[in-house]
Amino acid sequence: MAVGKNKRVSKGKKGAKKKVIDPFSRKEWYNLKAPVTFNVRNFGQTLVTKTIGTKLATDGLKGRVFEMSLADLNADEDQAYRKIKLSCEDVQGRNCLTDFHGTSVTRDKLCSLIRKNYSLIEAFADVKTLDGYNLRMFCVGYTKRRPGQLKSTCYVRSSKVRLIHKKMVAVMTNEASNSTLKELVKKVIPESIGKEIEKACKSIFPLQNVLVRKIKVLKKPKFDLTKLMESHNYSGEEEGHTLKVKESENATNLLTAELQSS
């Protein structure tokens, strides 16, 4: 028998179940708001740990990047091949105000455009928009058979590839430098930049299926809350409207009626 051992002291059972705490009880939901560039403004919700002491919930939300299909943001299934990245820039109440953070084309779309006996031409350019965003734009295009061509293959010489590269970079730089980020996104979605490249390269070699494959945001300007609010058309007027009810002509003030009767 061990010295000093007290048999009367009851021991706790080994392997006793610990109290299970639901992890979701410490979290809360926030709504995600897309800029006015897209048709669907409320595109989802996100979870974040509740504010505890000096750790604010909003600090955990700012900087988060969300990737969505353009088909969901514009309610158009024909645009499902393009993905859009939106980053949370500010939090207003329970709403996360997001801004454009990049775009890319799905791998399925790119693989569907590749054809045998045709040349693939790629180019990229570092551009800067009017509102101070530094972007890197990637472009891709494919050769096209000339009318009346008898040759089965449609390859292009390296000398012409270099000329097409220069045209692609020039068009992307020109389109970005003469527009804001919002205007540039509106050009990328309907593939208007790709059509401009096709027109510019027509004299060198005909191209087809030209599109902006990817856009990366390299550097953003200093955060401006006013511009972010403008991109969301956000105002406090959505809450607390003053309700004006038109009084009917037959209605009579009770106090006036009492005075008249007396």
Curated annotation (Swiss-Prot):
Keyword check for Cytoplasm: yes
Keyword presence, Endoplasmic reticulum: no
Signal peptide feature range: none
Compartments, record wording: Cytoplasm
PROSITE patterns, A to Z: RIBOSOMAL_S3AE (PS01191)
Alphabetical list of InterPro entries matching this protein: Ribosomal_eS1 (IPR001593), Ribosomal_eS1_CS (IPR018281), Ribosomal_eS1_euk (IPR027500)
Residues in coiled coil: none
Pfam families recorded: Ribosomal_S3Ae
Family assignment from sequence similarity: Belongs to the eukaryotic ribosomal protein eS1 family.
Stored PANTHER family: 40S RIBOSOMAL PROTEIN S3A (PTHR11830)
Protein's name according to its UniProt entry: Small ribosomal subunit protein eS1
Organism: Theileria annulata
